């Protein structure tokens, strides 16, 4: 059968999948659907987990179906054309830098990606002797880069105020708002504000749902829903006064966990677009589609190179799982921007799995003084905001034990004497030290350093002969590869711990409105009960032990989130109460007595009176 693919790919990309069929979880946005590939993720061993998540990541590069093109994809003509148009707008700012600015903005993972990319492209410009033109905005400020503060993305006015501050006095500002599910009020407000002020601002919306699936419930402090904002942007795109970049990348391997594919696709799409703008700006030409495709293929190669190490990634997954099962801690110690990736992975486990901030933590080794907008925000804020080398040496190293795991993440271009000195100090406390090492063909890890690591994942990259801007491709590849490894390891470890039901994050922490609606959808999916009954049960658990009054029932979602984000096991408690028709107190007692959250829920699902299998439940209603 002849190939239906238009482009030559580095990796074997999947054919269109079951999730693209019109009737598959029809009421649910793509970014919240369950991925058919991983519907039995909770039953998989470490090797299978790595394989499945690798297949999900490959879906990022999948082309749209030729016979039944349901959704536009990363390689779709419409997406590539929009990428080129946005690259041209960025070039206009680069050519006339006085009064110009490129803002990358988002909440949670999207905001952390905005931070990482602004750091990278400012470094690129400094290396050329140019004035840096990038900045980032993250809901909740710099503290949200290194700690879990997802609730801050629920305010549109907060987003607008932050944008006004950084854009004051500027003449031309490209604002790239990132919201994986097209749902974050922080971004919606900024996009609307930009459209009201097109003399200065050009808004670019990046997400991975069709606009018809953007969130449409009211934003508490804004006049429009996210969908209305996105629809307005689509109309203004006809005059190139706004742009929407929203290719479908398929559901997450772990349902709704946008830190994974959503974060990776954000990085791939925007680094491709921005790097193409920089590579061609001095040539006086607009970026070409060929330039975009060349860069996209290097990211495909990163997938190929990374997942060629699947067996070693699985070994690390098992080791991290053992540490967490024994109530130990996992410390991810990364050099330069790989340290940012490590911090992101640790922080995102908190709300994703209901983890403690000490369970998996990232640390950045290297100078970070020029990275943050307001570094003072991070001083003396408490242990959950610590992330530097000094923090690791003073607060972690003295208390390391044999049940902890330390993972060193570095390249052979880093200061290897510094790596060795720190590794030797860690080895004095614990033998459980691992490494993720990036090298280029021809480089080798010095023997004295190699022997310090009982187990290591060594990823060797081919030599690339690029100009200066192009040399950043390898830096971006290594960051993406590190992200894929760490996301897979931390997700896999929590799967092995019994935190996942099928491919759903049953024990997530309800930290913002998006997660509130996701919690409700899970209750509907697994209980088979009405939306009204599930809301009632969810609110009862959130506000327990206080009885629900009509005033509480009628309160805005933000009020419920404010209470819920401090509580543990909200969703499993509500689900048990629904399935067993028992009190909240009894549900809590059953969970407390169980060795695994998901085991007690599985038992309830298969018990008397549960007539339908999990698969039989209909689609939940998502606003």
UniProtKB/Swiss-Prot annotation:
Region listing for Important for interaction with GCK, in residue ranges: 199-200
GO biological process, one term: protein localization to nucleus
Classification via PROSITE patterns: GCKR, SIS
Disruption phenotype: Mice appear normal and are fertile. Their body weights do not differ significantly from the body weights of wild-type animals up to 60 weeks of age. Mice however show a substantial decrease in hepatic glucokinase (Gck) expression and enzymatic activity, with no change in basal blood glucose levels. However, following a glucose tolerance test, mice show impaired glucose clearance, possibly because they cannot recruit sufficient glucokinase due to the absence of a nuclear reserve.
GO CC entries: cytoplasm; cytosol; mitochondrion; nucleoplasm; nucleus
SUPFAM superfamilies named in the record: SIS domain
Keywords, in A-Z order: Carbohydrate metabolism, Cytoplasm, Mitochondrion, Nucleus, Repeat
Region (Essential for interaction with GCK): 463-465
Gene Ontology molecular functions: carbohydrate binding; fructose-6-phosphate binding; glucose sensor activity; kinase binding; kinase inhibitor activity; protein domain specific binding
Binding residue positions for beta-D-fructose 6-phosphate: 109-110, 179-181
Residues annotated to bind beta-D-fructose 1-phosphate: 109-110, 153, 179-181, 348
Top-level taxon: Eukaryota
Compartment(s) of residence: Cytoplasm; Nucleus; Mitochondrion
Predominant location: cytoplasm
Span of domain SIS: 90-286, 320-476
UniProt record similarity statement: Belongs to the GCKR family.
Domain notes from UniProt: Fructose 1-phosphate and fructose 6-phosphate compete for the same binding site.
Subunit field text: Interacts (fructose 6-phosphate bound form) with GCK.
Function: Regulates glucokinase (GCK) by forming an inactive complex with this enzyme. Acts by promoting GCK recruitment to the nucleus, possibly to provide a reserve of GCK that can be quickly released in the cytoplasm after a meal. The affinity of GCKR for GCK is modulated by fructose metabolites: GCKR with bound fructose 6-phosphate has increased affinity for GCK, while GCKR with bound fructose 1-phosphate has strongly decreased affinity for GCK and does not inhibit GCK activity.
Protein name as catalogued: Glucokinase regulatory protein
Species of the source: Mus musculus (Mouse)
């Amino acid at each position: 059968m002849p190939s239906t693919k238009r482009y030559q790919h580095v990796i074997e990309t999947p054919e269109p999948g079951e999730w693209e069929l019109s009737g598959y979880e029809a009421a649910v946005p793509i970014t919240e659907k369950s991925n058919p590939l991983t519907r039995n993720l909770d039953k998989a061993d470490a090797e299978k987990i790595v394989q499945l998540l690798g297949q999900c990541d490959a879906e990022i590069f999948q082309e749209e179906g030729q016979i039944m093109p349901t959704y536009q994809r990363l390689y779709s003509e419409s997406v590539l054309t929009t990428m080129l148009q946005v690259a041209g707008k960025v070039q206009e700012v680069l050519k006339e830098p006085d009064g110009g600015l490129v803002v990358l903005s988002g909440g949670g993972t999207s905001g952390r990606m905005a931070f990482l990319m602004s750091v990278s492209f400012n470094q690129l410009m400094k290396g050329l002797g140019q004035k840096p033109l990038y900045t980032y905005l993250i809901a909740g400020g710099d503290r949200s880069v290194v700690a879990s503060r997802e609730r801050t993305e629920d305010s549109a006015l907060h987003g607008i105020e932050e944008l006004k501050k950084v854009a004051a006095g500027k003449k031309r500002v490209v604002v790239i708002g990132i919201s994986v599910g097209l749902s974050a009020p922080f971004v919606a407000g900024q996009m609307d504000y930009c459209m009201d002020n097109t003399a200065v601002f050009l808004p670019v919306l990046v997400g991975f749902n069709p606009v018809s699936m953007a969130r449409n419930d009211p934003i508490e402090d804004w006049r429009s829903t996210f969908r209305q904002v996105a629809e307005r942007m689509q109309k203004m795109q006809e005059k190139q006064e706004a742009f929407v970049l929203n290719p479908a990348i398929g559901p997450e391997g772990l349902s709704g966990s946008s830190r994974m594919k959503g974060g990776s696709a954000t990085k791939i799409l925007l680094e491709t677009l921005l790097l193409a703008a920089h590579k061609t700006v001095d040539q006086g030409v607009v970026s070409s589609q060929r330039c975009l495709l060349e860069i996209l293929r290097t990211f495909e190669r990163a997938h190929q190179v990374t997942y060629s190490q699947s067996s070693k990634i699985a070994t690390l997954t098992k080791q991290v799982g053992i540490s967490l099962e024994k109530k130990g801690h996992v410390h991810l110690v990364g050099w330069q921007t790989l340290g940012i990736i490590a911090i992101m992975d640790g922080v995102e486990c908190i709300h994703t799995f209901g983890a403690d901030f000490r369970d998996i933590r990232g640390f950045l080794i290297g100078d970070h003084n020029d990275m943050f907008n307001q570094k003072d925000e991070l001083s003396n804020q408490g242990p959950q905001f610590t992330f530097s080398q000094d923090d690791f040496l003073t607060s972690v190293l003295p208390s390391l034990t044999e049940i902890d795991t330390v993972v060193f993440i570095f390249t052979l271009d880093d200061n290897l004497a510094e790596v060795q000195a720190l590794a030797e100090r860690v080895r004095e406390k614990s033998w459980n030290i691992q490494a993720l090492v990036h090298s280029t063909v021809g480089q080798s890890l010095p023997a004295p350093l190699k022997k310090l690591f009982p187990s290591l994942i060594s990823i060797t990259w081919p030599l690339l002969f690029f100009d200066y801007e192009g040399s950043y491709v390898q830096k971006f590849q290594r960051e993406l590869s590190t992200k894929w490894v760490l996301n897979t390891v931390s997700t896999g470890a929590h799967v092995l711990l019994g935190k996942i039901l099928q491919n759903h994050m049953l024990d997530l922490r309800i930290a913002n409105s998006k997660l509130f609606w996701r919690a409700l959808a899970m209750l509907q999916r697994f209980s088979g009960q009405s939306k009204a009954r599930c809301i009632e049960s969810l609110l009862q658990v959130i506000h327990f032990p206080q009885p629900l009054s009509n005033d509480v029932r009628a309160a805005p979602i933000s009020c419920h989130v404010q209470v819920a984000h401090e509580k543990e096991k909200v969703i499993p408690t509500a689900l048990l109460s629904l399935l067993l028709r028992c009190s909240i107190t009894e549900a809590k007692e059953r969970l407390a007595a169980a060795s695994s959250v998901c085991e007690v829920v599985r038992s309830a699902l298969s018990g008397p009176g549960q007539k339908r299998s999990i698969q039989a439940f209909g689609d939940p209603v998502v606003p």
